[in-house]
Amino acid sequence: MRTATIKRQTKETQIEVSLNLDQQSGIQIDTGVGYFDHMLNLLAKHGRFGLVVKATGDLEVDAHHTVEDTGIVLGETLKEALGDKVQIERYGDAMVPMDETLAQVVVDLSGRSYLVFDAELTNPRLGSFETEVTEDFFQALAFAAEMNLHARVLYGRNTHHKIEALFKATGRALRQAVTINPAIEGVNSTKGVI
């Protein structure tokens, strides 16, 4: 099974993430940021991953450090769980509607870090979650996992729906990309390594 657990501690946050790519063995999310917990739960559910996230941070300041550092640790955990990437599909693409909103996420588990984020999030706050940190989360995730991640909202009105559709689409795109395909010889690259 492709699993990994990584812990990270700084003066601002203490985070532990356990990820199981092959079995939805349970989802337990506790970051202290309710809306963010909900989004991570959706990512895991729609990616069909087992995911445990335990995070504490300087929420008396704001949620930024907790959200961004969780993205870093989740990305590192994904990278470790993938191992040598032999026979993975590598690419994933998902479009997800959420009422009036349509979001698309495309990933490439290429070993090259890059984020394109195109979403207008007009409501600055959802509970204790500052919506501008959504992009920071995806940036941290993409760079720590060493993947290309293109996330965009094609249209929509409600900020909650936009972010929710992005997290669901990320889960679905990652599910495609991490899927093992026995027809692939070695890694899915002409270079022989990703």
From Swiss-Prot:
It is an enzyme of class 4 (lyase). One of its GO terms (molecular function) is imidazoleglycerol-phosphate dehydratase activity. Pfam families: IGPD. Signal peptide: none annotated. PROSITE patterns: IGP_DEHYDRATASE_1, IGP_DEHYDRATASE_2. One of its GO terms (biological process) is L-histidine biosynthetic process. Keywords: Amino-acid biosynthesis, Cytoplasm, Histidine biosynthesis, Lyase. CDD domains: IGPD. It is found in: Cytoplasm. InterPro entries: IGPD_sf (IPR038494), ImidazoleglycerolP_deHydtase (IPR000807), ImidazoleglycerP_deHydtase_CS (IPR020565), Ribosomal_Su5_D2-typ_SF (IPR020568). It catalyses: D-erythro-1-(imidazol-4-yl)glycerol 3-phosphate = 3-(imidazol-4-yl)-2-oxopropyl phosphate + H2O. Its EC number is 4.2.1.19. Pathway: Amino-acid biosynthesis; L-histidine biosynthesis; L-histidine from 5-phospho-alpha-D-ribose 1-diphosphate: step 6/9. The keyword Manganese does not apply. One of its GO terms (cellular component) is cytoplasm. Belongs to the imidazoleglycerol-phosphate dehydratase family. This is Imidazoleglycerol-phosphate dehydratase.
